[in-house]
Amino acid sequence: MENSSAASASSEAGSSRSQEIEELERFIDSYVLEYQVQGLLADKTEGDGESERTQSHISQWTADCSEPLDSSCSFSRGRAPPQQNGSKDNSLDMLGTDIWAANTFDSFSGATWDLQPEKLDFTQFHRKVRHTPKQPLPHIDREGCGKGKLEDGDGINLNDIEKVLPAWQGYHPMPHEVEIAHTKKLFRRRRNDRRRQQRPPGGNKPQQHGDHQPGSAKHNRDHQKSYQGGSAPHPSGRPTHHGYSQNRRWHHGNMKHPPGDKGEAGAHRNAKETMTIENPKLEDTAGDTGHSSLEAPRSPDTLAPVASERLPPQQSGGPEVETKRKDSILPERIGERPKITLLQSSKDRLRRRLKEKDEVAVETTTPQQNKMDKLIEILNSMRNNSSDVDTKLTTFMEEAQNSTNSEEMLGEIVRTIYQKAVSDRSFAFTAAKLCDKMALFMVEGTKFRSLLLNMLQKDFTVREELQQQDVERWLGFITFLCEVFGTMRSSTGEPFRVLVCPIYTCLRELLQSQDVKEDAVLCCSMELQSTGRLLEEQLPEMMTELLASARDKMLCPSESMLTRSLLLEVIELHANSWNPLTPPITQYYNRTIQKLTA
């Protein structure tokens, strides 16, 4: 009996010791893992680079937004502030706040620009601390080290909770929990990148319900991550994006096609029909409001009239700013100055700026369907300066609702409005108003707004080809894009923030254009006058960078006097907080522009 009791006592002592040893080993392993993680944190930069290299093909849309983001908002990550003249050496990385990864067609389920733009949050652009989590992380019970610490009766009495807890209910994360969480996220991304790289072509397919493995929790986590700005495999097989290094990928993809390096293809343009403005004739016009209608394109032998009357400055806000001038001026002919060549559409927009009223018939396009006849007739009868434009907009909406019975018909209506808006820049503002009224019109689950934003997104991805093949359509697309941003609003009254970076990209490319310089600068100037205030409210850092480029271009000796005058007016308007300039300053720019285009 004594031997058996001694044996049982020794076995109990051995088991208790082994228990203590196991707990000690778990305790040591947890801290060893912590210090290993600390050592791996130093390799985060290299990990970002490896993750970047794995993304060999990205969408054209996200790649093209790299330069405005890389060069504007570097201090969003707590880095050095940008230089005064807009140095382009800084870069922006919207860590965890990448709206483009959530709104491109490469993201989960083929989401496009119309991913509820009113719900996009821009507040995290300005987070100063890179690794500060949105919410404090709870304390982690490391491998059950706290197990068995409380005996029966030692728990907290909930009735006396106020006596137990301190006055401040918050808690601080442990020293390295933020870094550990970030590193775990980085490990998961690198693991997913390696798996994606090892898959055969065509293997990047979303998991079907029939292929679910027992580990469905991980599959659900991947889906949840894609809704939070992460990524899921795209049906087309293209690699997906992560928010933490999206902008570096944009920059990497954009280095292949510098904006200014268009080659010789830009010299052959189908739609560039230029003519010199000669012998302007003066025509008195009656005062009108809104965007005035424009002439139909004239042949190069036709004389281009220049306006003699301009509206007085209006109050700030809205796309009516660019039509704010009224001044009687006699053009002066300067024989020694070289003649400035503008596109026909640019001359039309300049006449609209100078408020010349030309009521001309609009050519009716041949409808593909009989139901479209009346809609196109109403659409072509709309004039920007007519007093009954709102009535015609309402008539068009009612007719569209009555005749639209399928998704194809709705798509045809959107396509008709879009084609007219990008081909006739004078109609862009009216088209944007019409689109705003019909934004929530839905047929078979498809919204008018979704189809419109998809068309804008498609043209944005091929804008370089548009610039080389059809410069008129390129300028018309940029004009309509800015008008949509300045006019359309979400259901909560907010502008479509998803359009902010595309507009900045297009405006920067207008300033960098080496071919139709005056036309591009004129387009950039007029769009900044109409939407500059709203753009700066959404993303002021990129406006600072854009205006720095405008100053550099204005000081370049090779630029024409018209270019310098237009850019100087924009810079002065920005210095006046986008409020209308005083009448003497407005008259000065009016005379200068009229002399330079005479």
From Swiss-Prot:
Record-linked InterPro entries: ARM-type_fold (IPR016024), MIF4G-like_typ-3 (IPR003890), mRNA_TranslReg/HistoneTransl (IPR051367)
Similarity comment: Belongs to the CTIF family.
Residue stretches of biased makeup (Low complexity): 1-18
Basic residues biased stretches: 183-198
Any GO molecular function: RNA binding
Annotated region described as Interaction with NCBP1/CBP80, given as residue ranges: 1-305
Tissue and organ distribution: Widely expressed.
Region Disordered, residue ranges: 1-20, 43-90, 180-336
Gene that specifies this protein: CTIF
Regions of compositional bias (Polar residues) in chain numbering: 56-75
Location(s), subcellular: Cytoplasm, Perinuclear region
Function: Specifically required for the pioneer round of mRNA translation mediated by the cap-binding complex (CBC), that takes place during or right after mRNA export via the nuclear pore complex (NPC). Acts via its interaction with the NCBP1/CBP80 component of the CBC complex and recruits the 40S small subunit of the ribosome via eIF3. In contrast, it is not involved in steady state translation, that takes place when the CBC complex is replaced by cytoplasmic cap-binding protein eIF4E.
Impact reported for M438I: In a breast cancer sample; somatic mutation
GO BP annotations listed: nuclear-transcribed mRNA catabolic process, nonsense-mediated decay; regulation of translational initiation
Highest rank taxon of the organism: Eukaryota
N-acetylmethionine PTM positions: M1
Subunit structure, as described in the record: Interacts with NCBP1/CBP80; the interaction is direct. Associates with the eukaryotic translation initiation factor 3 (eIF-3) complex.
Residues modified to Phosphoserine: S18, S299
Domain MIF4G: 376-577
Compositional bias (Basic and acidic residues): 43-55, 258-272, 321-336
Keyword Phosphoprotein: yes
Modified residues (Phosphothreonine): T289
Cellular component aspect of the GO annotation: cytosol; perinuclear region of cytoplasm
Name of this protein: CBP80/20-dependent translation initiation factor
